[in-house]
Amino acid sequence: MKLIGITGMPGSGKSAITKLAEKYKIVVVSMGDVVRYETLKQGMPLNPENVGNTAVKLREIYGKEAIAVPCLNYVNEKYNNEDFVIIEGIRSIYEVNYIKKHAELDIIAIHSSPKTRFERLSGRNREDDSNDWNTFVERDERELNFSIGRVISLADYMVVNEGNYMDFVNDLENTFKKIINVN
């Protein structure tokens, strides 16, 4: 099984991979869903502060590989017979290193400017998103403290998402097809 890791700052366009995965019948496991699930398990409502604090606590408890460990266990238990599995939302170089110790992994980084990402996040109405610039910046700082910048800069592939959505999806699909060896 080969894993395809998707990384990028919040609002960069990582979730676009889900539509491509459906097209190619490839499973997607979201690391963010793991954190949101843990937040709800603790009885806390989903908002930027609670989800962010849960991510920090998970890393304090389990170390810097915290989200990768349960995520990879889940992938191995549920999808061991798949040729490819996408792990969406890798944020830490430690997570990358952990996964690479246990599986073949290629990383696709999706990049968008802070202004573009803030506009997207303000409009998508998810519980852990914010319409406030300062909260947005705090979230970015938290993500950068997880070493997501290193993951992005060391990614195997980079796709920029600043303009037309269909151009972005086409670029992402072309990158995706290189990894899964489809013409």
From Swiss-Prot:
<keyword id="KW-0547">Nucleotide-binding</keyword>
<feature type="binding site">
    <location>
        <begin position="8"/>
        <end position="15"/>
    </location>
    <ligand>
        <name>ATP</name>
    </ligand>
</feature>
<keyword id="KW-0067">ATP-binding</keyword>
<comment type="similarity">
    <text>Belongs to the UPF0200 family.</text>
</comment>
<dbReference type="InterPro" id="IPR022970">
    <property type="entry name" value="NTP_hydrolase-rel"/>
</dbReference>
<dbReference type="GO" id="GO:0005524">
    <property type="term" value="F:ATP binding"/>
</dbReference>
<protein>
    <recommendedName>
        <fullName>UPF0200 protein MMP1282</fullName>
    </recommendedName>
</protein>
<dbReference type="Pfam" id="PF13207">
    <property type="entry name" value="AAA_17"/>
</dbReference>
<dbReference type="InterPro" id="IPR027417">
    <property type="entry name" value="P-loop_NTPase"/>
</dbReference>
